């Protein structure tokens, strides 16, 4: 096994040079897609040896990672099932080690035949020694299409999406609006106060749909517009206070660095005729961790057979947070190459994603 390195980040951002940072303003943050046992599709993970598909085996590795190796002050987890949260993680990370937590489950899709508790969702765990809990909310993205005005809804209705099956074969066409209504993705918002500095931030965790760029882009727009509302509600009537609210947006965005979603988050205007859409949260989110590290630190964060790429993100603003350390990921690619393995999970890695672990300082 090639050991990943949790190494310092050399900063070149001019506005942060010489800025005073308190030692106690440091915290660690992790985002990680755990790979739900319900999604260990036999037709996808043909390259995984049978013992390493076993949920009990994978769960033991996840326990070691999250409770010991990579335990962060804030942990944002995707594809955690409701059953697993209630039966294990709520107490193991929460009660036993003094972490608070919140969870939201997706609604079961039409094809779902398993118990509702086996449906996955997203969770956020936070170290109560460092943070006070303020509030939380969870949203179902297909129920918030009212964030769009009539012109935008008309575009969503008229825009056609070419539908494909799991093997990328074309199976039909539908309006973008109807496709969005049929998807069950969620987003979790948790507002925390950092004990030592009094800083308030909102932590977001989501897992966007795995295909159709326009669907992922629209889901991201919904999240950003809802976040804008949450910030206004967090400190009502206190404009100066709102300026102190900092944002950490994490999750599996199923989107590469050159995707529509990432371009939108970076502030690129999305234009459709005379319809121009822009990220309302750009003043709060101006970069992701990959903007502050050498390109060779990561090859992929997802190693799901033929589906590989950098899909997992932490977004923030460089006037709010300074990225000080990151757990490199290129060693995983080297490990797979050396062992002639197609992807993850394997004996050492319980998920087809690798955890993205960071350390930040509050500015």
Curated annotation (Swiss-Prot):
UniProt-annotated location(s): Mitochondrion
Pfam families listed in its UniProt record: Exo_endo_phos
Entry keyword Hydrolase: yes
Enzyme class, UniProt record, top EC level: hydrolase
Alphabetical keyword list: Exonuclease, Hydrolase, Mitochondrion, Nuclease, Transit peptide
CC annotations in GO: mitochondrion
UniProt EC number: 3.1.-.-
InterPro entries per UniProt: CCR4/nocturin_mRNA_transcr, Endo/exonu/phosph_ase_sf, Endo/exonuclease/phosphatase
Transit peptide interval: 1-23
Predominant location category: mitochondrion
Source taxon at top rank: Eukaryota
Keyword Cell wall biogenesis/degradation set for record: no
GO molecular function, one term: 3'-5'-RNA exonuclease activity
Misc. remarks from the entry: Present with 3480 molecules/cell in log phase SD medium.
Family note: Belongs to the CCR4/nocturin family.
Name the record gives this protein: RNA exonuclease NGL1
